[in-house]
């Protein structure tokens, strides 16, 4: 009845058990936030999120921010870095002002992460970017594909697995630790 994926990564294994109660965990916050978007049961407004995404896609940002000051013309172009930085800050502002809930925040951050991945100037790994890269793609966010019929009791964690394992119970535990 309960499946725990305690090194859940991108959530591929957990998504195969959508008809069960899921417990996901990943120490990487970016993976955890995607798990919240895909697996956590919480009400959200799809129309609101799609409207925000459309607004973000039509943005033109000319002011610098953390992202542009630190990553311009490395993994992303200067323009995309400005846009990414603005969007990320705006998502947090909307969340802190209670304009969006935690599920909506997770949906927006997941959309941003996947849009960034599609245009990143890398060879598939983020340990280095391609020098003198050609930035011919631009940031385009889309609404994440989610299954709205997820179990009401699903739990998503961002904890050290060695500690978490003492606090959960499951009928099946999938363990695929990092091997890099």
Model segments located where?
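Conserved class I S-adenosyl-L-methionine
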Residues: 1-9
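Hydrophobic/aromatic beta-strand patches that form the interior of the parallel beta-sheet core
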Residues: 4, 23-25, 157
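Class I S-adenosyl-L-methionine-dependent methyltransferase module
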Residues: 21-23, 28-148, 180
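Conserved SAM-binding strand-loop segment of SAM-dependent methyltransferases
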Residues: 48-49, 152-160
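Short conserved loop adjoining the S-adenosyl-L-methionine
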Residues: 163-169
């Amino acid at each position: 009845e309960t499946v725990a994926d305690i090194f859940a990564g991108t959530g591929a294994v957990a998504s195969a058990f959508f008809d069960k109660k899921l417990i996901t965990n990943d120490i990487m916050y970016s993976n955890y936030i995607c798990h919240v978007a895909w697996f956590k049961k919480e009400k959200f407004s799809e129309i609101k999120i799609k409207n925000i995404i459309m607004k973000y896609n039509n943005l033109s940002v000319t002011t610098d921010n953390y992202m542009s000051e630190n990553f311009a013309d490395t993994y992303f172009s200067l323009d995309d870095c400005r846009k990414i930085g603005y969007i990320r800050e705006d998502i947090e502002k909307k969340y802190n002002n209670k304009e969006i809930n935690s599920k909506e925040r997770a949906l927006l951050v997941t959309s941003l992460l996947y849009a960034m991945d599609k245009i990143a100037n890398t060879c598939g790994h983020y340990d280095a970017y391609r020098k003198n890269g050609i930035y011919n793609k631009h940031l385009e966010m889309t609404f994440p594909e989610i299954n709205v019929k997820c179990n009401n009791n699903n739990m998503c964690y961002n904890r050290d697995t060695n500690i978490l394992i003492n606090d959960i119970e499951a009928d099946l535990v999938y363990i695929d630790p990092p091997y890099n």
